Amino acid sequence: MKLNKIHHVAVICSDYEKSKHFYTDVLGMKIVSENYREGRDSLKADCWLDDNYVIELFSFPNPPARPSYPEAAGLRHLAFEVDDLSEAIDELDGKGIAHEPIRTDEYTDKRFVFFSDPDGLPIELYEK
């Protein structure tokens, strides 16, 4: 099997409007499709970044919380590449988004930082 790329990552949120604001207004993604699925009582948004499908944002009634932070089995975090980490952190600060201190990858010598989405899903910004 030859995999070409990651097509998208699905994220279930507890507060759809809050998460929609976070992924669009804070992270700068664009919603290209948004639908209400009556049979599941669920909203679904397809979020794109630079013309690439990235996040499938779902709402479901009463989803359970993440079992632990962040070491539960399964998806650990989402990572996005940025050109300038300091500039990206300034934007997070300007939008009131708390983040951890900047760290440096011991293997690549690249800088990175972690913060969380509204449901506590860890997100990493990794400098190019």
Segment roles from a protein language model:
Residues 1-2, 35, 46, 89-128:
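Vicinal oxygen chelate
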Residues 11-54, 94:
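Core segments of cupin and vicinal oxygen chelate
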Residues 32-34, 40-43, 62-68, 101:
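A short, acidic/glycine-rich surface segment
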Residues 51-54, 62-63, 85:
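Short, charged/polar surface micro-motifs in flexible loops or helix N-caps
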Residues 71, 78-86:
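Mid-chain, well-packed structural core segment of small domains
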